Amino acid sequence: MDTSEPQESPKSLSNVKHIILILSGKGGVGKSSVTTQTALTLVNKGFNTGVLDIDLTGPSLPRMFGVETKQVHQSSAGWVPVSVYNNGQEKNEENKRGNLSLMSLGFLIGNRNSSVVWRGPKKTAMIRQFLKDVVWSGGENNVPLDYLLIDTPPGTSDEHIAIAEELRWANPDGAIIVTTPQQVATADVRKEINFCKKVNFDVLGVVENMSGFICPHCSECTNIFSSGGGKELSEKLDLQFLGNIPIDPSFVEMVEMQDNDQNDGKKKLVDLYDDCELKGIMEGIVDKVLEQQHPARF
């Protein structure tokens, strides 16, 4: 695998209009959940969306989208991502969803219980290959991908340097920073924001995840942890605060229901998400990102 520093944008991204990274200062803040729901929201808004899961230590997105048994295919042009949702119909007012595809190391390691015990050079080489060799398109007709979300490892490491080097010429829109309300999480987020400044990634905004708990019985939201840490950090650093996302047990149930026998119609997460309490919250967060109107890459 090639480990040399690139001098141009990866050709695999030439079919992608917008690139957004999802970053977190530390693990366990629900970054992959935010990535999943951001993708679902974009699809429901009619955008053809791709998700690149390069969190090599915990590639959980195949499980989140209910496609962990699917296989990645190799074409003459490169790896073909797994189709999570294919609208397959002409868009209209009643049917405006986009398509959704996913590429993840989880498809390549076979056993979901296997751990990835790799040294830094092998990790960075795999990340470079993911960014250069995946053939992104918005469906079977090779239409452009409107948005590519890149779910990154937590913290700042060699993997992040490799990501920054590969995307140096790709002109990404920027990064969404995910934190939880606690001070220990927001302190690490400062490091992530400093990293973005050093590698010239715009910070699109901060999301405070796990901000409260939605009762599954009465739907009332209770602050079981501290709250407001993400908003306070945003104000101090003059960044846009995108919103609070509470813990919603129903979303976890929807993820698990995809493989459940009770799911008679075998609904995908895209369909199940219509009934999620978090849907409206995520629409507000995504709208704030879209309102920034970053120009398309082509």
Curated annotation (Swiss-Prot):
Q: How is the cofactor bound?
A: Binds 4 [4Fe-4S] clusters per heterotetramer. Contains two stable clusters in the N-termini of NBP35 and two labile, bridging clusters between subunits of the NBP35-CFD1 heterotetramer.
Q: Which GO terms describe its biological process?
A: iron-sulfur cluster assembly; tRNA wobble uridine modification
Quaternary structure, from the entry? Heterotetramer of 2 NBP35 and 2 CFD1 chains.
UniProt keyword terms in alphabetical order: 4Fe-4S, ATP-binding, Cytoplasm, Iron, Iron-sulfur, Metal-binding, Nucleotide-binding
Q: Cite the source lineage.
A: Eukaryota, Fungi, Dikarya, Ascomycota, Saccharomycotina
Where does it mainly reside?
cytoplasm
Q: Where does [4Fe-4S] cluster bind?
A: 215, 218
One term of GO molecular function: ATP hydrolysis activity
**Function noted in UniProt:** Component of the cytosolic iron-sulfur (Fe/S) protein assembly (CIA) machinery. Required for maturation of extramitochondrial Fe-S proteins. The NBP35-CFD1 heterotetramer forms a Fe-S scaffold complex, mediating the de novo assembly of an Fe-S cluster and its transfer to target apoproteins. Required for biogenesis and export of both ribosomal subunits, which may reflect a role in assembly of the Fe/S clusters in RLI1, a protein which performs rRNA processing and ribosome export.
Q: Which Pfam families match?
A: ParA
Originating species: Debaryomyces hansenii (strain ATCC 36239 / CBS 767 / BCRC 21394 / JCM 1990 / NBRC 0083 / IGC 2968)
Sites binding ATP sit at 25-32
Family per record = Belongs to the Mrp/NBP35 ATP-binding proteins family. NUBP2/CFD1 subfamily.
Query: What's an example GO cellular component term for this entry?
Result: cytosolic [4Fe-4S] assembly scaffold complex
Q: What is this protein called?
A: Cytosolic Fe-S cluster assembly factor CFD1
Where does the sequence pass through the membrane? Answer: none
Recorded hits in InterPro entries, A to Z, give: Mrp/NBP35_ATP-bd (IPR019591), NUBP2/Cfd1_eukaryotes (IPR028600), P-loop_NTPase (IPR027417), YlxH/NBP35 (IPR033756)
Q: Which cofactor does it need?
A: [4Fe-4S] cluster
* Highest taxon of source: Eukaryota
